[in-house]
Amino acid sequence: MRLSLWNLLGLSGLVVASCPYMSGEDQEYHISHIQARGTDSEFLDQFKVEDSNSYLTTDAGGPIQDDASLKAGERGPTLLEDFIFRQKIQHFDHERVPERAVHARGAGAYGTFTSYADWTNITAASFLNSKGKETPVFVRFSTVAGSRGSADTVRDVHGFATRFYTDEGNFDIVGNNIPVFFIQDAILFPDLVHAVKPSPDSEIPQAATGHDSAWDFFSQQPSTLHTLFWAMSGHGIPRSYRHMDGFGVHTMRLVTDDGKSKLVKWHWKTKQGKASLVWEEAQILAGKNPDFHRQDLWDDINAGNGPEWELGVQIVDEEDVQAFGFDLLDPTKFLPEELVPVTILGKMKLTDNPTNYFAETEQVMFQPGHIVRGVDFSDDPLLQGRIYSYLDTQLNRNGGPNFEQLPVNRPRTKVHNNNRDGAGQMFIHTNKAPYSPNSLSGGNPKQANQTKGRGFFTAPSRKVVGSLHRGTASSFADVWSQPRMFYNSLIPSEQQFLVNAIRFEISQLKSDLIKKNTLMQLNRVSNDLATRVAAVIGYKPLDPSPEFYTNATTDYVTIFGKPLPSVVGFTVGILASTSSSTSISQAAQLATSFSSRGIRAVIVGESLLSGTDQTYSSADATAFDAVVVTMGAETLFGPVAKPNTLFPSGRPSQILHDAYRWGKPVGAVSKASVVLEPLPGTKNQGGVYRVESVNELATSIAKGLETFRFVDRFPLDS
């Protein structure tokens, strides 16, 4: 049996202790800087166009009429001289820009980051230099593989990119909701993307990996297994963007003003708690509401319930880069928090939706190369490639080098450099000596460095040794132990979800060779997992391959094993009947009670009469985090229900049954509790509430939402 990660640490003499930076004590900061505005609204307002009380104009500003083209005669051909027609059509023809190759489907929001303390003891980054300092941010969440028109709830890694508009320039953390990545070297990125994208002949399937080319690559490139396991778990189908953590993925450096550096891993920890959909629900949502995640984020911010995350770092001494049994430069590995706790630096709250999706969310252009004084790179080979690739792809999407001048990309500080011209240049430069060094302009703009002008500087501790080498570092070789640790760390229901997800994917493969290769790789992680997958696709169990089997676990990867700290923003479906005044009255009382807790309530009835929000014909259990039935609505359920032309037969029962099957809290008031009887195994199960009063039901459902999903309803492999 291979030694566990913990045993390796014990043998190496490593001491696992709490982080020395956890105290968060303020320290005197000797350099004063203007604090970046928290709201950022004044900066953006200068770019907004308000059309109230105005006339149409050309792009050149002349008033026009553009609802009819200029023709030769009443019924004649359109004239070439019709500059209004040509301008309108030409601009329309060029409205679309190249779609992002990955992360095309996304949603964004503005907010504010607030530092909890003066962190100048670990970094010279100005946005962390004082307690309470606020910095405007823009965040873009996304899926990875699908096109811009794909659904939100597909199974995928999810992007979590954050821009800090600091008072010393823009700083981007271009991360994901999963702490690791598929590959160790950026040179393999085109291969990864080509493999998971739709087939080049049929353009099928969209935003999905259940096809031969994806699993051919996964099984031939086992570095993908760790990220794949995260994606096949609940992390691949989050309940919302609000309910997922974020990670910088790469090891970076924080550097102090005097040049002392530490290795760090960035973490965003959701204040809402982690929550996930279940797979059948996610699939139905992709058809019923492909905008589910972006709508959830938009609605919550509009309601004043903008989500929050805490930003933290794991801090490691430079010399400990390989002290944990793996190499911190390997982006397919994560550092368990039991080994190095996360030091929480501050909090981000999202408060404002974009004014224009294209101008802001589509045109925002993140780059790992957007770093500021006090932050530095590591030698992670994936990171090194991303620094180049992200800049290059922005040039392609924007058609020129001036994309940083777009409003959403502009820093909130003055820009002074010798970059000139290019398509879409928006500045009028007055410096006649755009080169360095110069004497004609007094040497301006001057060079900024570690001691002058608070310039960016590379950590003095960085050094490179060794011969040129094309290949993967030997310290990156073990790509099976950490996927096993992840699998070990899931509760049984989550393990079953992961097994079922892989079964779903593998059962769609056509190639027997790819199936066999996949089982071989799974078996190197877990014989239990490989055996359970093999049973579904008709293969015999494999003998254990124990070289990388470890009993190591971590407490920080499970989703369903912990109660949520907040239920604000969840939605409860209240099933009522417009033919019963008691039902509608109870529904209104429940809605008021839920609203007081920050929970959305949707009253569903046969028609949109006063007191209802949605009809049964359009309602579905996927839209609700819990479902309750009011007294009087029981007549719409089961054998007593009369045929109704206002909604599909059995729809009220279907909503309740689906909610129960997907582990959601369900309940009913008094006589309506009869509708719960047909649900399988509900007599003593948690999350099923039979109560006599409206207040009791509201309290019970709110408590049940803290559990979120009652996973004991899902069967386990025997």
Curated annotation (Swiss-Prot):
Transmembrane segments: none annotated. Its cofactor is heme. Its EC number is 1.11.1.6. Pfam families: Catalase (PF00199), Catalase-rel (PF06628), Catalase_C (PF18011). It is an enzyme of class 1 (oxidoreductase). One of its GO terms (biological process) is hydrogen peroxide catabolic process. Its main location: other. It catalyses: 2 H2O2 = O2 + 2 H2O. The keyword Magnesium does not apply. One of its GO terms (cellular component) is cytosol. One of its GO terms (molecular function) is catalase activity. Keywords: Heme, Hydrogen peroxide, Iron, Metal-binding, Oxidoreductase, Peroxidase, Peroxisome. The keyword Cell inner membrane does not apply. It is found in: Peroxisome matrix. The active site is at 103, 176. Heme binds at residue 390. PANTHER family: CATALASE, CATALASE B. Catalyzes the degradation of hydrogen peroxide (H(2)O(2)) generated by peroxisomal oxidases to water and oxygen, thereby protecting cells from the toxic effects of hydrogen peroxide. Belongs to the catalase family. This is Catalase. It comes from Blumeria hordei (Barley powdery mildew). The lineage of its organism: Eukaryota, Fungi, Dikarya, Ascomycota, Pezizomycotina.
